[in-house]
């Protein structure tokens, strides 16, 4: 990315890697936002996938046209100076909360799947994150390009094995949800992830050579996200008592595709790790704009705060924080829908 303009495939992989974090890769987000509505949740996945493709493209095109260097400039463009600054403060707390969720997810991974202390998992993640952030953002894009294809391949393997070897089909049923709750949940999921992804997508758009590349990258990325979401949904629908697990997808892999269990756990950790690093980068840039302190102190303060918050527990954080963030993010999606993209800059 740094040596030349990015390609559509690079953009797509980073897009997927930005959206796919602890909740997505472990299956908790799929359970909370989609599977609990039965097969109506599958239609919700298609709605979210459409949002990732269309609104993701619009977000990045606007960013390129206004030459936004950070999501703060994007929010000021969408909401105006006063409201934009308020939204930016809100985003500061959102990114901090999501970082706590990612840390808690790492702890749950070590505890539930490896039999180790959750505290060890969180501290290892914190240590690795701080080490990487001393080198800047050079490795962020490379990690996504490496991890995302593996995630897609293993998702396909797991969904195939789970349907071959499982006798359960009870997790997803034709249950009639209350009114349009499944649709609101799907839109909320898309809004949440798009509003968070702007921390990476907004500056990334200026790494692309043209709007054509952006549109193609958004299409590929949105399609890949829809495929991975669908595969995870179908796999989880075969797991008995799916709602009892903090990391249900890892349980599916363990039961029906045991040969790739440890590799999939590594992929989950990779997604958690890249999400933590991305959030750290976005938070540090925002804090630096109003508090000129050395980066290492900001990183340390962020991780200490996130570590304390993560003690609430991964499952509880996902169930309460994510839906709340999603509903508030609807304002961001509404502004993105209503705001007209500025004219293309003349060459």
UniProtKB/Swiss-Prot annotation:
One of its GO terms (cellular component) is plasma membrane. Keywords: Cell membrane, Membrane, Transmembrane, Transmembrane helix. It is found in: Cell membrane. The keyword Cell membrane applies. InterPro entries: YkvI. It is a multi-pass membrane protein. The keyword Cell membrane applies. This is Uncharacterized membrane protein YkvI.
């Amino acid at each position: 990315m740094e040596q030349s303009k990015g390609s559509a495939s690079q953009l797509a992989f980073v897009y997927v890697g930005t959206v796919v974090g602890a909740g997505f890769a472990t299956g908790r987000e799929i359970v909370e936002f989609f599977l609990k509505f039965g097969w109506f949740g599958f239609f919700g996945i298609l709605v979210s996938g459409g949002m990732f493709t269309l609104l993701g493209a619009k977000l990045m095109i606007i960013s390129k046209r206004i030459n936004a260097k950070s999501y703060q400039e994007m929010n000021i463009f969408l909401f105006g100076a006063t409201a934009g600054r308020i939204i930016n403060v809100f985003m500061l707390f959102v990114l901090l909360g999501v970082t706590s969720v990612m840390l808690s997810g790492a702890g749950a991974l070590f505890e539930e799947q490896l039999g180790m202390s959750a505290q060890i998992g969180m501290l290892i993640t914190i240590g690795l994150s701080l080490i990487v952030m001393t080198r800047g953002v050079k490795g962020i894009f490379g990690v996504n390009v490496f991890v995302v294809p593996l995630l897609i391949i293993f998702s396909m393997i797991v969904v195939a094995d789970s349907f071959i070897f499982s006798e359960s089909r009870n997790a997803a049923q034709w249950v009639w949800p209350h009114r349009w709750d499944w649709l609101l949940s799907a839109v909320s999921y898309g809004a949440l992830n798009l509003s968070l992804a702007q921390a990476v997508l907004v500056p990334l758009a200026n790494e692309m050579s043209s709007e054509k590349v952006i549109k193609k990258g958004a299409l590929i990325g949105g399609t890949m996200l829809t495929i991975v979401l669908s595969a995870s949904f179908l796999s989880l629908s075969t797991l008995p008592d799916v709602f009892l697990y903090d990391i249900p997808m890892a349980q599916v892999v363990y039961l029906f595709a045991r040969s790739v269990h440890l590799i999939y756990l590594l992929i989950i950790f990779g997604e958690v790790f890249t999400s933590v690093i991305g959030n750290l980068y976005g938070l540090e840039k925002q804090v630096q704009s109003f508090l000129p302190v050395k980066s290492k102190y900001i990183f340390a303060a962020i991780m200490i705060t996130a570590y304390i918050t993560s003690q609430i527990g991964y499952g509880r954080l996902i169930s309460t924080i994510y839906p709340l963030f999603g509903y508030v993010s609807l304002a961001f999606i509404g502004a993105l829908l209503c705001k007209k993209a500025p004219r293309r800059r003349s060459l």
